[in-house]
């Protein structure tokens, strides 16, 4: 046993099946120069020392693996397995995508940093990998999206179904989602087939990015970079939420929202221009209170006379995103 090895490590087999360090190809980020992976391993070792009862759990989920992709694939495979979609099969799927796609490798890390920076309940990188279903669902979606784009649509839809069953988060594999995304809690989030989400967006629980129920083709919302969607927001139709906009909790949005603006209500009304350039990073959720003060202070005709969200108010360019 060397100086860096914990006492329990020599007593467990390596749980990760499939790819080993010697088999990494040139597409994989070098695990020897990955500061996030280094931090994750250090966190896991410290937690194992503090809580010995979890030592085998931490070893199996993190310390047995050579890189972040291996560890994440192992965790996702064990979370999503069922009697007809085995963990070993899922490991092959996740490794086959994550070990060879630099775009997904980048997104995995940017998303992880977003959870660590913006979610006060996320105590560490390792806690996101091991415990946070919003992170799990997002990374499993990324694999399903890759499969969808490769024409393996039945397998992608099977993954979508398992993600929805296990995590309560329904993301169509054809949706296009950027990186640096936070799905805080994640419960009840629904993202439709033609939705587009830009980089750096924060999404709270219960958010729906849906169609109107009657259209086909491009029918779902487009969310600009750095936007913040509060809890239980519903956005319907092929409309744009501008970059850096904030949609307050409980709002129903049916029209375009200007960039760097705050909207709230049912239907949503324009409240003010954002002071913060990146509300998704600030994670301030006070716009709903502002809206009700706005109503209580005498704007009885807000629905008919208040500033409306017309197409002319919006910057029409759709958001940059990764596919």
Swiss-Prot record:
InterPro entries membership: Hexapep, Hexapep_transf_CS, LbH_SAT, Ser_AcTrfase_N, Ser_AcTrfase_N_sf, Ser_O-AcTrfase, Serine_acetyltransferase, Trimer_LpxA-like_sf
**According to the UniProt entry, where is the signal peptide?**
none
Return the EC number.
2.3.1.30
Q: Which reaction does it catalyse?
A: L-serine + acetyl-CoA = O-acetyl-L-serine + CoA
Positions the record marks as coiled coil are none
Key word Phosphoprotein present in the record?
A: no
Q: Which GO terms describe its cellular component?
A: cytosol
Reported induction: By cadmium (Cd). Induced in roots under sulfur-deficient conditions.
Molecular-function annotations in GO: serine O-acetyltransferase activity
Swiss-Prot/TrEMBL GO biological process terms: cysteine biosynthetic process from serine; sulfate assimilation
Which compartment or compartments is the protein found in? Answer: Cytoplasm
Tissue note = Ubiquitously expressed at low levels. Localized in vascular tissues, particularly in phloem.
Provide the assembly information: Homomultimer.
- The family this protein is said to belong to: Belongs to the transferase hexapeptide repeat family.
Please state what the protein is called. Answer: Serine acetyltransferase 2
